[in-house]
Structure formats: structure tokens, C-alpha cells
């Protein structure tokens, strides 16, 4: 992957949302260590806030993404090898499949530290982990395996809920496919899915409460206006009304 980065990509820092988030969490915007933003989940915001207070000057948002990328790659390889062994194939067959996945489909996500692609990499690893679960080992083992897969899916959700949705669809599709192909009993699949649903249900509820707070209304309205004016078509194509709502002007 490092060779891919050096020879096949243009290595540079780009002023994208990731840089803005790293700066805001790091106290580089107005000298305030932020604990909330409209993109990442509340729990991740609290974690970044605490780490920045304890060890300031570190780009913790980028560190968290690098950790998520490493864990996602490791989980994909390990899960592919376990799945191969369950199919009575040599472990190297799973390793080869995982390497093909990492270099073929996941290379861009693993070598671009952007929260959207990091979420995609974590979601892909979650599907690998789901397929590798031994669903015949009983309900407790099924729940543990599903939660292990759900943790990777949860990492994608914490980074960016919108980017996590495609991974969620693939995860649910893999769950249904396991049942239809009779690779796993439906009761075990249901127990695993229910455990993951509880985890996400609590997180969605916490996020909804935070977003509904009156003090967030003006900030969220400004972000919505800015997104409409700038992100969809650029400043040149933005209407004057949209620019005015975001506090900008055509000039």
C-alpha cells in the first residue's frame, strides 16, 4: 500500500473537510477545542475533545482515521483467512483473497485519509468480519461475532453517517444472503442483528437529542445554507439568495 501511495498517487495535503475538522478539534480555530460538529457523531467528538485537552497539538482526528484504516485492513485479512478455513480451504487462499480486495477495491480508501473513504474501508471490513462469523456455534457466539462486525460498522457511522449508509446496506444484504444460502440459522442471525441494532439505536438517540438542542439551531442552519451555496455547484453557480443565507456575497 505504501508503494501504491508513492508511485500511483499525488501525495499532498488538501484543504478539505478533514483538515478543517482536525483543526477545529485541535483548538486551531479561535483557540477553542471543539467537542461538536455537524459531521461526526457526538461520541467521536467527545473523544477528540478529551484527547486534545490531554495532549494538545496532536491531529487526533487524523490519528483516529489512521487507526481505523489499520484495524480495517487487519480485520479484512484475518476474516478472509478464517472464512477460508471454515470452507476447508488453506489459509493462504483467504490471505490471497484479502490482498486482492485491499489492493483492488480498498486501495483508494486505505491510502486517502479522508473520513468518507475511511468510513467506506471500515464498512467493507465489517462485511468481511460478518461473513467470517461461526454462526453454527450457538447464539452467544453469534452475538459476539455480530458485535465484532458491528463495531467496524459503528466506526464508519461515528465518522460520517451519510458515508456509512451504503456499508449498512451491504452489511444487511450479507446477513440476508447468509440466511438464504443456509450458511447460518435465522435465529442466530436475528440475535446478532438485534444486538447491533441496540448499539446503533442508543447512538442515534443521543445524536438526535444533541442536534435538537436550541443552541445548535443557528449553527446547523448556517451549515445547511453554506452547503447549499458552496458544495452544490460551487460559488460561481450559487444563487444570490443561497449566498446571502450563508453570510456570503456574489462579490
Enumerate the predicted regions with their spans.
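Aromatic- and kink-enriched transmembrane "portal" helix at the membrane-lumen/periplasm boundary
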Residues: 58, 95-121, 154, 158
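Membrane-interface alpha helices of multi-pass inner-membrane proteins
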Residues: 144-160, 172, 195-202
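Membrane-interfacial entry segments at the cytosolic side of transmembrane helices
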Residues: 87-90, 139-144, 180-197
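Extracytoplasmic loop-helix module adjacent to an early transmembrane segment
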Residues: 2-37, 48-53
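Transmembrane-embedded, aromatic-rich helix segments that form part
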Residues: 161-177
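Short hydrophobic/aromatic helix or loop-helix immediately within or flanking a transmembrane segment
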Residues: 34-59, 63-68
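Transmembrane-helix motifs of polytopic, lipid-linked glycan transferases
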Residues: 67-87
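Juxtamembrane membrane-water interface segments immediately following transmembrane helices
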Residues: 165, 188-251
